[in-house]
Amino acid sequence: MELRHLRYFICIAEELNFKRASEKLFIAQPSLSQQIKDLENELGCLLFSRKNRSLTLTEEGKQFFLDAKHILDLSKQAIHNVKTISDAKKNKLNIG
């Protein structure tokens, strides 16, 4: 599982529509559907319930949504923290 899978899942979960999510993510709908199918296979459960062209999150999907958002937030924070340290080192003035 890669961070992109989490981003794809979150977008679909927020849109509750594969077509709109694929347009928002700039990825072909069949490819996005396959990515989610692969993710569900890896997790061993369905994340979405698909009935009569309606898409809803399963109980597992609801929990995964919360966890995936948390993981992406932590990832963004980690990147920010490293860049802050790196930028501070670049701007450090050494005298003597």
Listing of model-derived features with the role each one plays in the protein:
Residues 10-31:
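Short helix-boundary/capping micro-motifs
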Residues 42-43, 64-86:
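Alpha-helical linker/hinge and terminal dimerization helices associated
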Residues 40-60:
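A short LG(V/I)-centered, amphipathic sequence patch enriched
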Residues 2-5, 29, 54, 61, ...:
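The N-cap/first-turn positions of alpha helices
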Residues 7-10, 34, 49:
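Base-recognition residues in the alpha-helical recognition helix of bacterial helix-turn-helix
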Residues 83-96:
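Interdomain hinge and pocket-entrance segments immediately C-terminal to HTH DNA-binding domains
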Residues 15, 24, 37-46, 79:
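Residue cluster at the C-terminal edge of the helix-turn-helix DNA-binding motif
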